[in-house]
């Protein structure tokens, strides 16, 4: 009997050991919580798909993916849940060359959240709206705390290191990218490919992000975002940016939003034709929509560019600016600092704004035209010898018809500004333009007039 008992005990122990071994071979990597029910999965794809219509997905450990990834969250079935990476790393996200739109770990994020996850060794390729974490954000979705540690992200249009695009309403914050980003057509951004369209009562935000990956496009290109109607603040770019309408932070800021307290140290290069517009240390081109785009930009406001710093060289084609390459019509340009020692273009260049001009009012919804508020707290250390162009200036080059630039120093509380004028003129023009200055205690109004 003792021998039989010993044999039975040995068998039980062996079975127990075998059960533990089987469990370790199929380890759970994520869990999904919906309501009061939590389910663990050995497949990240299964966990994410289980929460597409709502719920929380959490990583339980680092994950190494094998094979090709199939994007979760499509146009017909977007991802509406929350994915919390808990600081873990997903290695080997591989999406091979294809003609699909909305490509990434998650294709379309509809009001959901992706946060606190790292990606290593990514290889993500699609057609349009391509990003490592999310292809497109809609309906107020949020992406935060995502780190892309290296690899490549590529496509035709709207390609971002973290997010391909934001449409009208959404937030990307505290993300970093070190992957190379390439758009074979246009709209490549180190963090977000494009943040575009406007809707009444809705806002887009890109804040506190860092890009360290080279960004290249055949068209609009930005170190943080390419085409933007978002509020872009507190971001840093250190990498080279090459494209047309190219900026160290924003390629083209259009119709709406603000660009504040960003820093660029990456070299900015316009690779377009000789007449290509816009190369800026912070923004390549600032402008407003045309009548044909009224449906895309039904809400407009004067764009503010304040508190930004650039130290990266700027090489343009038609124009280049240490902060903004080209400004159309209206903007508020205050308290920006350029320390780049090389700013060059064929025609127009300056330490802060390379080319300010007015164009015909784009649309009835566009803000009041022909007013540029340019603060005397904008500074540039670049000398005229370090600025190369046919028409150049230490701070801003004005170019156009009946242009008024208002320099507004901060008034002291003890002595509010008085609005009387003492006319005094001087010739401060370069090239074919002259500048007439009207001095007052409120500042200086500048008007560009063509030489005769």
Give the role of each language-model region.
Residues 15-28, 421-428, 448:
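Sec-dependent signal peptide cleavage junction
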Residues 1-25, 452:
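Sec-dependent, cleavable N-terminal signal peptides
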């Amino acid at each position: 009997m003792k021998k039989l008992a010993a044999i039975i005990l040995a068998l039980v122990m062996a079975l127990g050991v075998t059960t533990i071994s089987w469990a370790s071979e199929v380890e759970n990597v994520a869990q999904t919580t919906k309501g009061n029910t939590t389910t663990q999965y050995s497949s990240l794809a299964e966990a994410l798909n289980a929460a597409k219509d709502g719920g929380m997905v959490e990583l339980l450990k680092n994950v190494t993916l094998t094979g090709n990834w199939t994007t979760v969250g499509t146009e017909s079935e977007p991802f509406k849940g929350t994915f919390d990476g808990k600081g873990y790393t997903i290695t080997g996200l591989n999406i091979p060359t294809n003609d699909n739109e909305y490509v990434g770990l998650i294709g379309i994020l509809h009001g959901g959240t992706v946060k606190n996850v790292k990606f290593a060794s990514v290889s993500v390729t699609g057609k349009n709206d391509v990003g490592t974490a999310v292809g497109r954000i809609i309906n107020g979705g949020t992406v935060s705390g995502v780190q892309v540690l290296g690899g490549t992200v590529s496509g035709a249009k709207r390609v971002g290191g973290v997010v391909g695009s934001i449409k009208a309403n959404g937030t990307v914050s505290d993300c970093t990218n070190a992957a190379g980003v390439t758009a074979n057509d246009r709209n490549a951004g180190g963090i977000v490919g494009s943040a575009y369209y406007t809707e009444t009562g809705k806002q887009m935000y890109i804040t506190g992000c860092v890009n360290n990956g080279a960004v290249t496009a055949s068209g609009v290109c930005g170190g943080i975002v390419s085409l933007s109607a978002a509020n872009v603040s507190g971001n840093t770019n250190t990498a080279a940016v090459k494209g047309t309408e190219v900026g160290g932070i924003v390629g083209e800021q259009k119709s709406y939003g603000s660009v504040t307290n960003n820093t660029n140290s990456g070299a900015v290069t316009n690779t377009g034709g000789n007449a290509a517009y816009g190369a800026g240390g912070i923004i390549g081109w600032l402008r407003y929509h045309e009548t044909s785009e009224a449906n895309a930009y039904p809400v407009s406001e004067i764009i503010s560019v304040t508190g930004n710093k650039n130290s990266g060289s700027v090489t343009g084609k038609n124009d280049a600016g240490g902060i903004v390459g080209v400004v159309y019509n209206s903007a508020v340009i205050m308290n920006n600092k350029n320390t780049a020692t090389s700013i060059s273009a064929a025609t127009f260049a300056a330490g802060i704004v390379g080319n300010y001009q007015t164009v015909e009012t784009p649309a009835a919804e566009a803000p009041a035209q022909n007013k540029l508020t340019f603060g005397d707290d904008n500074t540039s250390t670049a000398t005229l010898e370090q600025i190369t162009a046919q028409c150049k200036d230490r701070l801003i080059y004005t170019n156009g018809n009946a242009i008024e630039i208002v320099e507004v120093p901060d008034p002291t509380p003890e002595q509010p500004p008085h609005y009387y004028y003492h006319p005094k003129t001087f010739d401060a023009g370069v090239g074919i333009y002259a500048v007439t200055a009207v001095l007052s205690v409120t500042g200086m109004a500048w008007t560009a007039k063509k030489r005769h």
